[in-house]
Curated annotation (Swiss-Prot):
Acts as a regulatory subunit of the 26S proteasome which is involved in the ATP-dependent degradation of ubiquitinated proteins. Pfam families: HEAT_2, PC_rep, RPN2_C, RPN2_N. Residues 279-322, 855-950, 999-1020 are annotated as: Disordered. One of its GO terms (biological process) is regulation of protein catabolic process. The modification Phosphoserine is found at residues 298, 303, 305. The lineage of its organism: Eukaryota, Metazoa, Ecdysozoa, Arthropoda, Hexapoda. It comes from Drosophila melanogaster. Residues 294-307, 858-867, 876-939 have a biased composition (Basic and acidic residues). The keyword Phosphoprotein applies. This is 26S proteasome non-ATPase regulatory subunit 1.
Length: 1020
């Protein structure tokens, strides 16, 4: 018989005999889930029994009390009594009570552990009973093979002992290491603890049977430990095993893609010292000091600078030796170090990507021609120049500009600077000939000048050498010192900032600061941005103080705007270290400095997905009184979320419907930045109504640009709205009634969506998951086009070629093939535009009214008759015949303006009739032919790609190396980028890909006739 009340059992708790109380507690423990309301009225008695240490089953009393409090919803008390129950609390029990208490226990333990580690002096010691339950829980996970759960608890509770156990005890150690690395980089916000975990991962990678050098290197980049990286590379290059040498090259390529200039410089310096003959190494990169020779110096200057270098090198035994005196092992080591230096200095990567972009250029000039014909306003002229630069970014093809020199010459004043700087985007990465390319625009010693072209040329040099400026910095620095004109100084500052990005060089900073202190608005704006670029992520207290104090003093809004960006760049990726600066900037009375606070949050927490940062930005987005600050706050959300783009639409969806147009614009840009290149449908769904229906034109401008960022390199198969948006851009541009602002956005969008000859994507993180430093900086500077159009060019820093480039041991591209296991159309280039529209317009323009034509003919005929004095009858008849013919011709004109076409149609109809009459046999033949075509038409399910291959980001997952080739990759090809292959066949079997010349494959060159055959000229 089932119980209807617990009153009888509860009454036993008042009995004096302990055995009866124990009996009562055991019964209550069994029925507590059903009768907890009744038991709760006597909870005090149970609590007293628990606290009575002489009572034999005081732990059981704690267990009952814990369950009662759990049902009452008082989880903290429930946890306290569960801890008091000791071993009676079974962590392995599978019920709601146990799971809830364990969850609360872990949360409580995490809070105590974190507080104890971060504030050991103030925090109380962690409760041992809590730790006991957590330990049992971890052990349960390990016993049940729930290694990921154990690893998660270990990271949350900061237990490095458990972290190691969870990885090493698992069945798949490499898989667990990869999972641990991803979790560490995406979820751990605290910089100090993240570094501790990464150090642990490095030791685990090193202890594997075959050390995982690639991932070790990724961890060491985050740890900012260049010497450990250099040591690893040195060990690999000393090895006589070819695989180890090739692995060193692969690591060097990954390093160049992921690390800062300063980090690479330190690795290079350390590597040079380990070489058998350091002085024999090429000096392509010298960090923190004077840079190597640039193209502007003469041969004599070069030899002098080489002598200086050798003088600076300490005179030791290595200097006296020559290459010939080395043994075979040392020669190999020297050669390997030379190759590493060429890779780490960026020469090889930049040259290979340039080759790929030139070779694969599929930019559609017809798009630009259509835009050029449609625009009539100077702003749109500038936009078209910028769009052309984006479209040909890195391809070195300036075909469109050469074809339209008269049109280009319309650019005046600052538009001329923008146009000249666009050459820097087109020739991005074409570093060897950069000075020769820009020679005709660069400042010259003699002759007066407006300075717009010269400033643009210096800015262009910065764009060509962005984040890789060792060979051009000295030239730019000298030009900036010599500049007499504010326009030249403006371009010089921007160029120097881009080339010296992240070098933290004091001499560059001082020169830029000197230009800032001239109190010239135009120069000061560029200097402010450039100072931040040079001191990128340095958290240099002196630099921040200089910039903030000058920002508070200056009266020039332009200078303030430049400094707002510059200040934020100094805190790049500094996480919580930037909080004090953010707090002071956010509370400033000047709205431009408050805006700087928003940019600082964006830069400090870029890519972290930090909830704290997003909360702060959302608060400002809805509360600040200044529209610019609100717009910046919403835009900044995009920078925080670019590693988890799928979260961005839900965060900004309400802001996208705000009454404030600046907030709507910010929401559009945030979507563009966070979801760049993803083709995310949720993001496009938010942008589409903005583009079509928003009443404010600058919101439409932002939405158009953002849509192109998201749809870059997407086809209708991967994102159904792709063609719709391409057509929309063309419609907005050609519509005479559209506002200039919307047109500007549409023109830029056309350039962005086809960037890099349709071979580049927008990406704020590298393939290996690191923040793409120059891309984030370029994107932030691009958002400033709102105030200053020339800054739009910096978006080119975020364009990443989507290629897989295979290299052999000589760092050359061998002829080899990859297989893409997907239909070719899924990742194909968009179809080129046809030139139909312009032809139709010409025909319509030449239409003549038939009545007018007939009237003219009659008048002419009458005049001729009047002029003739004597007329024969024969001639009269002839004239009558002619008149009849003319009348017939007139009638013909009435019916159709294009008689030739009509004749052709009629002929076709007649032919069709003849064919129909030919009988059923021909029809049967036709049907057979159709069937054959239909059978041939099914698209192949895969395609073969030649090295170097254009492989889209979403295509990488279906990419593989074709079997049967004599090349084996040193890392997974699905990561993409530059991959070193080991050649397993004979050395003489290798066929190499022929390099192509820069300036791109010109259309004119293709049409040129062949030269005549050789012949002898004999005089008579």
């Amino acid at each position: 018989m089932s119980l209807t009340s617990a009153a009888g059992i509860i009454s036993l708790l008042d009995e004096p005999m302990p055995d009866l109380k124990v009996f009562a507690l055991k019964k209550l423990d069994n029925i507590v889930d059903e009768f907890w309301p009744e038991i709760s009225e006597s909870i005090e008695k149970i609590e007293m029994l628990h606290e009575d240490r002489s009572f034999p089953e005081n732990k059981l009393a704690g267990m009952v009390a814990s369950k009662v409090f759990y049902h009452l919803g008082s989880f903290e008390d429930a946890l306290t009594y569960a801890l008091g129950a000791g071993d009676l609390f079974d962590v392995n029990a599978r019920n709601e009570y146990t799971e809830t208490i364990i969850a609360k226990c872990i949360d409580f333990y995490i809070a105590q552990r974190v507080e104890f580690i971060e504030n050991p002096k103030e925090a109380s010691v962690v409760d041992e009973r809590l730790e006991g339950i957590v330990n049992r829980m971890i052990q349960r996970c390990l016993d049940d093979n729930q290694f990921r759960q154990a690893l998660g608890i270990a990271l949350e509770t900061r237990r490095m002992d458990t972290f190691k156990d969870a990885i090493m005890k698992s069945d798949d150690v490499r898989g667990m290491l990869a999972y641990a690395y991803n979790v560490t980089m995406s979820l751990i916000q605290n910089r100090g603890f993240r570094n501790e975990v990464l150090r642990c991962l490095v030791s685990l990678y090193r202890d594997l049977g075959v050390p995982d050098y690639v991932n070790m290197c990724q961890c060491l980049i985050f740890l900012e430990d260049p010497f450990a990286v250099a040591e690893m590379l040195d060990n690999l290059t000393r090895s006589s095993v070819e695989t180890n040498n090739l692995m060193a090259y692969q690591i060097a390529f990954d390093l160049y893609e992921s690390a800062t200039q300063e980090f690479l410089g330190n690795v290079l310096q350390h590597l040079k010292n380990t070489a058998p003959i350091p002085t024999a190494l090429p000096s392509t990169f010298k960090p923190q000091g004077t840079t190597s020779e640039d193209g502007a110096k003469s041969e004599g200057d070069k030899s002098k600078s080489d002598e200086d270098i050798t003088e600076e090198t300490p005179a030791d035994d290595k200097v006296e030796r020559t290459i010939d005196s080395l043994n075979e092992v040392e020669k190999l080591h020297q050669k390997n170090i030379e190759k590493l230096i060429s890779i780490l200095s960026g020469e090889v990567s930049i040259d290979l990507q340039l080759q790929f972009l030139i070779r694969s250029n599929h930019a559609d000039l017809q798009v630009l021609r259509g835009t050029k014909e449609a625009v009539r306003v100077s702003i749109c002229h500038t936009a078209t120049v910028i769009a052309n630069a984006f479209m040909h970014s890195g391809t070195t093809s300036d075909q469109f500009l050469r074809d339209n020199l008269d049109w280009l010459a319309r650019a005046t004043n600052w538009a001329k600077l923008t146009a000249t700087a666009s050459l820097g985007v087109i020739h991005r990465g074409h570093e060897k000939d950069s000075l020769a390319l820009m020679q005709s625009y660069l400042p010259k010693e003699a002759g007066p000048s407006s300075g717009y072209s010269e400033g643009g040329a210096l800015y262009a040099l910065g764009l060509i050498h962005a984040n890789h400026g060792a060979n051009i910095i000295d030239y730019l620095l000298q030009q900036l010192k010599d500049a007499q004109n504010e326009n030249v100084r403006h371009g010089g500052c921007l160029g120097l900032g881009l080339a010296g990005m992240g070098t933290h060089r004091q001499d560059l900073y001082e020169q830029l600061k000197f230009n800032l202190y001239q109190d010239d608005a135009v120069t000061g704006e560029a200097a402010g941005i450039a100072m931040g670029m040079v001191m990128l992520g340095s958290k240099n207290a002196q630099a921040i103080e200089d910039m903030v104090s000058y920002a508070q003093e200056t009266q020039h809004e332009k200078i303030l705007r430049g400094l707002a960006v510059g200040i934020s760049l100094t805190m790049f990726s500094r996480l919580e270290e930037a909080d004090p600066l953010v707090t002071s900037l956010s509370s400033d009375k000047d709205p431009v400095l408050r805006r700087s606070g928003m940019y600082t949050i964006a830069m400090a927490y870029n890519g972290t997905g930090s909830n704290k940062a997003i909360r702060k930005l959302l608060h400002v987005a809805v509360s600040d009184v200044n529209d610019d600050v609100r717009r910046a706050a919403v835009t900044a959300i995009g920078f925080i979320l670019f590693r988890s783009p799928e979260q961005c639409p839900s965060v900004v969806s309400l802001l996208a419907e705000s009454y404030n147009p600046h907030v709507r614009y910010g929401a559009a840009m945030a979507l563009g930045i966070a979801c760049a290149g993803t083709g995310l449908r949720e993001a496009i769904a938010l942008l589409e109504p903005m583009v079509k229906f928003d009443p404010v034109n600058f919101v439409r401008q932002g939405a158009l640009i953002a849509s192109a960022m998201i749809l870059i390199q997407h086809t209708d198969q991967s994102c159904p709205k792709s063609t719709f948006f391409r057509q929309l851009y063309a419609e907005v541009i050609s519509n005479k009634h559209e506002d200039v602002m919307a047109k500007y956005g549409a023109i830029l969008a056309q350039g962005i969506i086809d960037a890099g000859g349709r071979n580049a994507t927008l990406s704020l993180q590298s393939r290996t998951g690191h923040t793409n430093l120059q891309a984030v900086v370029g994107m932030l500077a691009f958002t400033q086009y709102w105030y200053w159009f020339p800054l739009a060019h910096t978006l080119s820093l975020a364009f990443t070629p989507t290629c897989v480039i295979g290299l052999n041991s000589d760092l050359k591209m061998p002829k080899m093939e990859y297989k893409s296991a997907a239909k070719p159309s899924l990742y194909a280039y968009p179809a080129p535009l046809e030139e139909k529209k312009s032809e139709e317009r010409e025909k319509v323009a030449t239409a003549v009214l038939s009545i007018a034509a007939r009237q003219k003919r009659r008048e002419n005929a009458d005049k001729k008759e009047d002029e003739k004095m004597d007329v024969d009858e024969d001639s009269k008849e002839g004239a009558a015949v002619k008149k009849d013919e003319e009348a017939k011709a007139d009638e013909k004109m009435v019916t159709d303006e294009k008689p030739k076409k009509k004749d052709e149609k009629e002929k076709k109809k007649e032919e069709d009739k003849e064919k129909e009459a030919a009988g059923t046999s021909s029809e049967k033949d036709k049907d057979k032919e159709k069937d054959k075509k239909e059978k041939k038409e099914p698209e192949p399910t895969s395609e073969i790609l030649q090295n170097p291959a254009r492989v889209l980001r979403q295509q990488l997952k279906v990419l593989s190396v074709i079997d049967g080739q004599s090349y084996e990759p040193l890392k997974d090809v699905t990561i993409g980028g530059i991959i070193v292959f080991q050649h397993t066949g004979k050395a003489e079997d290798q066929e190499l890909v022929e390099p192509v010349a820069a300036f791109g494959p010109m259309n004119d060159e293709e049409k040129e006739p062949e030269p005549p055959e050789p012949f002898e000229y004999i005089e008579d």
